[in-house]
Amino acid sequence: MALEVSNLCVKIAHKDILRGLNLHFPTGKRTAIIGPNGAGKSTLLRVLAALNTKYEGVVSLDGEDLRKISRKKLAQRLAILPQGLSAPPDITVGALADYGRFPYRSWHHSGNAKADREAVEMALVQTGMQDFRDRQVMALSGGERQRAWIAMALAQQPEYLLLDEPTTYLDIAHQLEVMQIISRLNREQQMTVIMVLHDINHALQYADEIVIIKDHGIFAQGQPEEVLNVDMLAKVFGVRADIFVNSQGASVLSPVALVQE
């Protein structure tokens, strides 16, 4: 069983955003969602996280309609990091990570304190943020701040981790750092990762499965080497590109010019 989408249609202000999507997200794999700006990538991610429930069709988790699963139960299985997150003023890294334990608490019960501490500590260690626990989030660099947000998501102990352009605004080193953390979580914990990426080469290197969205529908889905090629770049993004193999034996796409109409 897995996270699946059947005939998904989303409209906003009577405008088609997604139309007739059918998708299966392989359990324990890394799926990258790519496509041009405005294609509906972030909308799809919000639907998968039940942040947007105004749609036609069915989104199911292990065969159960997502809209019938309680928000608390869903948050224990699925965590999402949208774009543009803003931390409360003066909050520390440790306190932010502790927010990830909210799905395990209720208004009349604080939860299992020992389990919460262990989950938060593990999340900080997994992201290399254990020595930053008492630092204010707003005082961190961009890369450190993104790792702090990932730690919060990991404290939920989810089976599914959804990320919307997790490397946006980061320099090359911090992009690599974040992508390696995500891949390690997938490899060591068999965590299912679904991420919207704008960097095609990140998708080539760090995804097991690619979903390409164009004109509000699925242009292609498959393994990176099957769907990421110069023909796709021309048709979906309108650019000509070269493809070569780098020193690590990985394929790299290098855009060189716009496609001439």
Outline where the language-model segments fall:
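Catalytic Walker B motif of ABC-type/P-loop ATPase nucleotide-binding domains
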Residues: 161-165
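Conserved ABC ATPase "signature" region
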Residues: 98, 113-132
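Conserved ABC ATPase signature
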Residues: 136-140, 144
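H-loop (His-switch) and adjacent beta-strand-loop-beta switch element
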Residues: 210-223
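Conserved ABC transporter NBD signature motif
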Residues: 57-65, 74
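ABC ATPase nucleotide-binding domains
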Residues: 236-261
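Helix-to-loop junction immediately C-terminal to a conserved catalytic motif
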Residues: 49
